Amino acid sequence: MATPAAPRTISFADNNDNQPNQQQRGRGRNPKPRPAPNNTVSWYTGLTQHGKNPLAFPPGQGVPLNANSTTAQNAGYWRRQDRKINTGNGVKQLAPRWFFYYTGTGPEANLPFRSVKDGIVWVYEEGATDAPSVFGTRNPANDAAIVCQFAPGTLIPKNFHIEGTGGNSQSSSRASSNSRNSSRSNSRGGRSTSNSRGTSPVSHGVGSAESLAALPLLLDLQKRLADLESGKSKQPKVVTKKDAAAAKNKMRHKRVATKGFNVTQAFGLRGPGPLQGNFGDMNYNKFGTEDPRWPQMAELAPSASAFMSMSQFKLTHQSNDDKGDPIYFLSYSGAIKLDPKNPNYKKWLELLEANIDAYKTFPKKERKPKTTEDGAVVASSSASQMEDVDAKPQRKPKSRVAGSITMRSGSSPALQDVTFDSEA
């Protein structure tokens, strides 16, 4: 299918799939497709809201499955459609319906990505971009609505029903009717030519060349979904000594903590010191960015631009190295406003309360003193909090604190008021 130069839109109008039979008998083998309606129609069946709670998805969830899309394309918005009916006793409000549209398509095609507007809920997959989508307008006269499906693990809001599944016989019957019409058209020897504008999320026609070409992709998608449900989606990653050494050789503030290179290995023990971090419970310290809560945690982290533009910086001369060259530390501080109107506001507070200063509750781990052959006791030395820092501040006598971690009780006065530090 030819791709227009300009981004295409998915049309959604009143999202009503009750169209007359597009294939009428006696019109030849290749009936002319009906033109697309003026209004836009979603590619997917909608979500019916049966309660007062608004639609909301956790970050990284809420985009319907699409066999023809890439991760970068999986972003868009859900739009609320308020409904009412005139009765003998006046106007009666019906349950609202929500329909999905890709970014840059549908009734809100000109709405910038993640713009705040009543009745609009933005969703995206991790790694998606804010570029307008290439998926075009669906012509309901030629294409049946795709029953909305989500990736395993997606948390569908309470009191929301996916149309076309379960007891929604009306939507299911419409989809079945359109499917029979398409099959009847192909059985007469012709292939239904879609008049939908732009790329379709699915291939058209039963047994068509497009369907056969997409079959391996659909089978692969089915296998991936089955693997996700069975927990076999990822092979265990083996971290070799070479990989660990390479990760450790990175500058401290450029490292990424994972299960194979955990938070303590990457950034040191949690604690109150000026060169220590105080964020992270036992689970986060073990898994790092592989913690299931990481997507919500990452939303609180500023971007590189925000970090450089919102922070108060201070350059401090700490000491000199063996060659006499000065060693500097770049100290920074700042603040992030937590918006109570954000749907993840309560989740953020839960995460912060569970992870800030969580090291104070870590279980104590006693160390057995080493003994020599003559029975003398040798005190064991603790690991440095900053193995990659060549020169360290002058220390006062070491003392034991919670968690049996040997901490520095004193440091350079210039760093006493700094919460986090990074090497310049």
UniProtKB/Swiss-Prot annotation:
Functionally, this protein is described as follows: Packages the positive strand viral genome RNA into a helical ribonucleocapsid (RNP) and plays a fundamental role during virion assembly through its interactions with the viral genome and membrane protein M. Plays an important role in enhancing the efficiency of subgenomic viral RNA transcription as well as viral replication.
Entry keyword annotation includes Ribonucleoprotein = yes
Q: Which residues carry this modification: Phosphothreonine?
A: 406
Query: Subunit arrangement?
Result: Homooligomer. Both monomeric and oligomeric forms interact with RNA. Interacts with protein M. Interacts with NSP3; this interaction serves to tether the genome to the newly translated replicase-transcriptase complex at a very early stage of infection.
Region Disordered: list its residue ranges.
1-41, 159-207, 230-251, 365-424
The chain residues annotated with the modification Phosphoserine are 133
| InterPro entries registered for this protein in UniProt | N_prot_C_CoV, N_prot_N_CoV, NCAP_bCoV, Nucleocap_CoV, Nucleocapsid_C, Nucleocapsid_N
What's the chief localization of this chain?
A: virion
Q: What is this protein called?
A: Nucleoprotein
Where is the secretion signal located? none
